[in-house]
Amino acid sequence: MERYNLKAEVRKDTGKGVARKLRRNGLIPGVIYGKTRKPQPLAVDAKDLNKVVGGNAILDMTLVDGDKEEKETAVVKDLQRDPVQGNILHVDFQHISMTDKLTVSVPVHIVGNARGVVAGGVLQQLAREIEVECLPTDIPDEIEVDITDLGLGDSLSVGDIEPPANTDFITPEDEVIVTIVAPSEAVEEEVPAEDEEIMPEPEVIGEEDEGDEEEPEE
């Protein structure tokens, strides 16, 4: 488990206008909260934030409020990104205690070459993350799933794999992670018959134009 230092500025002003101004100045608006902590709006340097996201790293945060500094331990709980450019728009930090368990989502890493794929089947991955509960120091970087023995028509669920050391799965055991299907089953789009007339969708009268996507609330 990686551990990083991250500095953030405590902010008093909120709202979309404030958020846009922060982003123009290279800062990302955010908030930190926890079971025993009131939500506190923050601003984080975009470059610094991009260096620590992408995993379940533990963050030793320094919260700067004027001439005061406060130390907190946290993890990134949620990221909101621009749907087109992928830039981070807002970040949620969760305050944690190193002695209390927490629930996090861990990426699934597929390994092996399934027998069913060798026989001409298609691998479909239905779950890309699994929720686990553990102490912060036991958060795994990924959960390895070996699909070597899967044949055509086989599937593998959460209950079929062992949780990493010192962790418990929160995701239901019956949730399917991967399945091997025949090539014909992998084709989802139906092609209309040649003699089937395709009717145009009716025009909706009086429907208002959709506005721009709202930015996340700050």
From Swiss-Prot:
Question: One Pfam family name from the record?
Answer: Ribosomal_TL5_C
Enumerate the GO terms in the molecular function aspect. 5S rRNA binding; structural constituent of ribosome
Q: Where is this region: Disordered?
A: 186-218
Source domain of life: Bacteria
UniProt keywords, alphabetically: Ribonucleoprotein, Ribosomal protein, RNA-binding, rRNA-binding
- Which GO BP annotation is one of this protein's? translation
Give the record's GO CC terms: cytosolic large ribosomal subunit
Q: Gene3D superfamilies from the entry?
A: Ribosomal protein L25, beta domain, Ribosomal Protein L25, Chain P
Similarity-based family:
Belongs to the bacterial ribosomal protein bL25 family. CTC subfamily.
What role does it play?
This is one of the proteins that binds to the 5S RNA in the ribosome where it forms part of the central protuberance.
Description of how the protein assembles with itself and partners: Part of the 50S ribosomal subunit; part of the 5S rRNA/L5/L18/L25 subcomplex. Contacts the 5S rRNA. Binds to the 5S rRNA independently of L5 and L18.
What this protein is called in its record is: Large ribosomal subunit protein bL25
